[in-house]
Curated annotation (Swiss-Prot):
Chain ranges on the Cytoplasmic side, renumbered to this chain: 27-44, 88-156
Protein name stated in the entry: UPF0266 membrane protein YobD
GO cellular component: plasma membrane
Family note: Belongs to the UPF0266 family.
Stretches that traverse the bilayer: 6-26, 45-65, 67-87
Sorted UniProt keywords: Cell inner membrane, Cell membrane, Membrane, Transmembrane, Transmembrane helix
Keyword Lipid biosynthesis in annotation: no
This protein's encoding gene: yobD
The UniProt record lists the keyword Membrane: yes
Periplasmic side: 1-5, 66
Chief place where the protein resides: membrane
Compartmental location: Cell inner membrane
Amino acid sequence: MTITDLVLILFIAALLAYALYDQFIMPRRNGPTLLSIALLRRGRVDSVIFVGLVAILIYNNVTSHGAQMTTWLLSALALMGFYIFWIRTPRIIFKQRGFFFANVWIEYNRIKEMNLSEDGVLVMQLEQRRLLIRVRNIDDLEKIYKLLIENQYLKI
């Protein structure tokens, strides 16, 4: 096993750990889920570049009669990239005391201001950061509003 194979195994393990955390562990952290909303994906250009570069590496390894183990590891890396970038759906998960956005826990008391832009983007201003929440279904913005009002996280 070469150093290249070890690095590939490390990257595959890291992507697998991230996928498991995102799919199974994060929704169970910090209490029961009150609301889970699907978000729009950001640009897929980065993902196309990543999967394309891995495909080039697979092609190069096969044509130069490289190690079969490396080809399999590169294929596994390409599949993990495909899952994370195209199959997995980004979500915002609302809990009792806060919410997960981009895998980061944010307490409700950190929200200083909320606005809705003309194109349907919910803007939450935190102490030093601005969150741009782009929901997949525009009706989900009303669900978020109702949740925040009913639980009195948002003061009118």
